[in-house]
């Protein structure tokens, strides 16, 4: 009598078991997040590892494990766990960015870093850090013209994002596009006042031997950041010596 119902019974038991496995996995993951937020990384790592024991395809837990390994200096451990997450979910943005950071910083391979950052960009085009990372990596490869639009895009997302100004200023200076640099920074300064934008704009004016323009940037910069203003003034003073 039970034979016709046996396949259904097996399915129900399997489904029940699978759901039972998911519940402790989610609980361990949640406790891992709590430990992480309280900077208890050893306890967090234990919790996340228990989560993936109960749920082998827990991509978020693998990413958290990878992040902890990277933070503790275990680069290979981080790499391995990011790869596990991407094997489950190839479009997992955080894992793609994590891989990009490894190949940008810990295991320098800029071509590989660009592959992962560009993949991350396809899944999330609103992340300023990804655009910044692309600008940084292109600058590191001395591909300065390619770096410029990525730095600009990062600033379109967050006009006060200072790391992007650093890459933008470096790329413009390396290509000697000083007039273009000034025009772009004028646009940024029209959106919001940012000290580093005045600084790089002032440097560009000195490169064009435009002392008046450089001094204007210096006066504005002095109002908001005296230390940066002093650095710019040193550059301007050298122009005066050369006159």
What do these predicted ranges mean?
Residues 24-26, 59-60, 93-94, 128-129, ...:
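Helix-start (N-cap) detector for alpha-helical repeat units in TPR-like alpha-solenoids
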Residues 30, 64, 98, 133, ...:
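Canonical tetratricopeptide repeat
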Residues 17-54, 59, 243:
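N-terminal leader/linker segments that initiate helical-solenoid repeat arrays
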Residues 29, 36-37, 63, 69-70, ...:
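Position-specific recognition of the canonical hydrophobic site in helix A of tetratricopeptide repeat
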Residues 54, 88, 123, 157, ...:
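Structural marker of alpha-solenoid helical repeat scaffolds
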Residues 24, 192, 199-243:
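Terminal, low-structured helical/coil segments at or just beyond the last alpha-helical repeat
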């Amino acid at each position: 009598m039970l034979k016709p119902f046996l396949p259904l019974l097996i399915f129900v038991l399997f489904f029940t078991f699978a759901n039972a496995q998911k519940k402790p996995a989610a609980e361990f993951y949640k406790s891992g997040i709590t430990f992480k937020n309280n900077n208890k990384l050893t306890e967090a790592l234990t919790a996340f590892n228990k989560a993936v024991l109960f749920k082998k395809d827990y991509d978020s837990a693998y990413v958290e494990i990878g992040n902890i390994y990277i933070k503790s200096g275990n680069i290979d451990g981080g790499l391995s766990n990011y790869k596990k997450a991407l094997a489950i979910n190839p479009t997992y943005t955080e894992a793609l960015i994590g891989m990009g950071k490894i190949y940008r910083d810990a295991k320098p391979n800029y071509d590989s870093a660009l592959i992962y950052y560009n993949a991350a960009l396809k899944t999330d085009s609103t992340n300023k850090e990804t655009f910044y990372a692309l600008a940084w990596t292109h600058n590191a490869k001395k591909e300065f013209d390619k770096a410029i639009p990525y730095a600009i895009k990062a600033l379109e997302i967050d006009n006060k994002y200072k790391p992007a100004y650093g890459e933008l200023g470096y790329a413009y200076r390396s290509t000697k596009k000083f007039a273009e640099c000034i025009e772009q920074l004028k646009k940024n300064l029209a959106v919001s006042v940012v000290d580093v934008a005045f600084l790089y704009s002032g440097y560009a004016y000195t490169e064009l031997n435009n002392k008046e323009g450089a001094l204007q940037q210096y006066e504005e910069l002095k109002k908001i950041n005296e230390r940066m203003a002093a650095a710019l003034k040193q550059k301007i003073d050298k122009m005066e010596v050369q006159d």
